[in-house]
Structures are given as C-alpha cells and as structure tokens.
Amino acid sequence: MGYLKRFALYISVMILIFAIAGCGKGNETKEDSKEEQIKKSFAITLDMYPIKNLEDLYDKEGYRDSEFKKGDKGMWTIYTDFAKSNKPGELDDEGMVLNLDRNTRTAKGHYFVTTFYRNGKLPDEKNYKIEMKNNKIILLDEVKDDKLKQKIENFKFFGQYANLKELRKYNNGDVSINENVPSYDVEYKMSNKDEIVKELRSRYNISTEKSPILKMHIDGDLKGSSVGYRKLEIDFSKRENSKLSVIEFLSYKPAKK
C-alpha cells in the first residue's frame, strides 16, 4: 500500500509543479448542490474536449485572476499518464506533459517513464524532452529503443480523443469536501458501455472487465483559480493494493513569473 500512497502524493506534487510552473435530508440537498458545482467547474475545461489539434489552445483563453501580469496571455498545460501494477511491489507510470505558451505560441514538455517501489527504494524516473509543432510531437532527446521512440512520437493526450458528454448523466456520486484546503472530490461508477471506457481499454490494452470508477478532484476555488488544479482519473483497479488507471488534467496558468 505504501508505494500506492507515495504514487498518489507524487502525482499531486507533479501536477502542482506543472500547474504553478508552466445523513439528513438537509445534508443530502447540500451535498447534491456541491456535487453539481464540482461538475460545472470541471465542465469549464472538459467541454472543450476533444481537442484534436492542441494548437487550437493558442487561441483559447482560460480563467484569469490577479496572478496574471498585464499582457500575459497565459499558458495551457495538458497532462496524461497511465499507471499500472505490472509486478508485485512495483508500479509503472508513463505519460506526457506539455506546456503551450500563448505568448510565444510554442509548446514544450517531456515524456516520462517512472517505476515506484513498495520497499522504500527511490523511484526510477526517466524524462525525454519533447516539443510540438504543427500538432505533431517531436522528440528532442535520443532514444535508442525504437518501440519507446514510436510510442512517444505517436502519443495522444486523453483530451485529444475524449468525448466526455456522457459524464453529464452521472449523478448521486460519492462527494468528499475539505473546506480548509479547499479541495473537492466526487466519484462515480462508470459503465463499460461508455465510449470513453471502450476507447481507453483499446488504447491501453486494459483486459479487466471491472467497471471503472470516475474520480474528479479539484484543488482551489470551484469558480476558478490559477493556483489550483482539476484532476480527472478513470480507475480500472481490481484490488485495493493494485493500480490501473488513467489520469488527465488541463490547466491554464500565468506564463510570466
């Protein structure tokens, strides 16, 4: 379990780094209201999906607040990773993060391959620099493994193919709120008939027949914030001590410090 907790913490820290760097009736009504607010907050970005051409983001403006300097057009950050427990005591995590600067209309990031260990051993992590031009991923580092090289160059972010209109039908989810952070979470059991579930099974060769859990997490103000983030996870894990999930986030932050 320990390495799964470390993985969750690691992902949260990574997202923050990427985001900053580049029982009664009355209670049920309150929870339902907050659930709807969480869904509407996610809709700010999810309604943009699928973004088949990521360069379209150069012409889209997100939520602006006082953190933005005058004249700063901002930066979009898109992130997708796939985590899977392939061996006992190990967790493999692969994905990509890309920062799209609207000021310079340039996109740079990296592909990462990380292995976490249960026994306290430090993670093995490899990063490969990339850039995007004409909606095409260009590998900047030398990669001798042809299979990995092709995987990087042909990589598609979740947001490029995901049509999430089906999410609107989900209701009465499991809601968790921490007003001190603030942070908000809601979970729904998805259907194997959902198109996005079928798409993920095909792309990542997910063989388990278990219906996945949709997890929506928000750090920061529900109305929007340049210091918070929204994370979406579709979790196919079969057991508590295993991991099989796809994580995605899209954020809009100041590009100028």
From Swiss-Prot:
A Pfam match: DUF576
Report which superkingdom the organism of origin falls in: Bacteria
Keyword list, A-Z:
Cell membrane, Lipoprotein, Membrane, Palmitate, Signal
Task: Identify the GO cellular component terms for this protein.
Answer: plasma membrane
Q: How does it sit in the membrane?
A: Lipid-anchor
User: How far does the signal peptide extend, from start to end residue?
Assistant: 1-22
**InterPro entries recorded for this chain?**
Csa (IPR007595), Csa_sf (IPR038641)
Q: What is its main location?
A: membrane
Listed NCBIfam families: SA_tandem_lipo
Tell me which family the UniProt entry assigns to this protein. Answer: Belongs to the staphylococcal tandem lipoprotein family.
Q: Could you tell me what this protein is called?
A: Uncharacterized lipoprotein SAUSA300_0410
Organism equals: Staphylococcus aureus (strain USA300)
